[in-house]
């Protein structure tokens, strides 16, 4: 959030902080969640770039559309392993995976 927006919200009595602070997450928990969100976003972006529906991707992964939806939403039941394997099945290289992890908008 931009500084001006934070100031404006604080001036109106809103408490401005991070999700990490709000949820009381440790640094490790916060990093894990951020990694999962980046991979999930990367999966959605790559699927859309390939012109696939969630159902198409589910068939490719021998899974269900609802499972793909959970993967793209970063659902807690989805493992990092499954997200990475799914990205690889869509043709993501090691370099592209590292770009997704470093910068979610890069890949």
Locations of regions flagged by a protein language model:
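Alpha-helical DNA-recognition elements
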Residues: 70, 74, 85
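N-terminal flexible/basic segments that precede or flank functional cores
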Residues: 1-38, 99-107
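Short alpha-helical DNA-recognition segment
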Residues: 51-70
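Alpha-helix N-cap/N′ positions at the starts of helices
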Residues: 38-39, 63
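DNA major-groove recognition helix of helix-turn-helix/homeodomain DNA-binding modules
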Residues: 79-97
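Residue-level detection of the helix-turn-helix DNA-binding "recognition helix"
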Residues: 62, 73-75, 102
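Short basic helix-loop element that most often maps to the first helix and adjoining turn
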Residues: 12, 41-56, 85
């Amino acid at each position: 959030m931009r500084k001006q927006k934070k100031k404006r919200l604080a001036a109106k009595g809103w408490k401005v902080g991070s999700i990490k602070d709000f949820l009381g997450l440790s640094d490790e928990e916060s990093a894990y969640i951020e990694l999962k969100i980046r991979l999930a976003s990367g999966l959605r972006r790559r699927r859309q770039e390939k012109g696939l529906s969630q159902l198409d991707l589910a068939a490719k992964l021998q899974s269900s559309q609802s499972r793909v939806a959970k993967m793209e939403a970063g659902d807690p039941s989805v493992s990092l392993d499954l997200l990475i394997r799914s990205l690889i099945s869509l043709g993501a290289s090691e370099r592209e995976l590292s770009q997704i992890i470093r910068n979610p908008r890069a890949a």
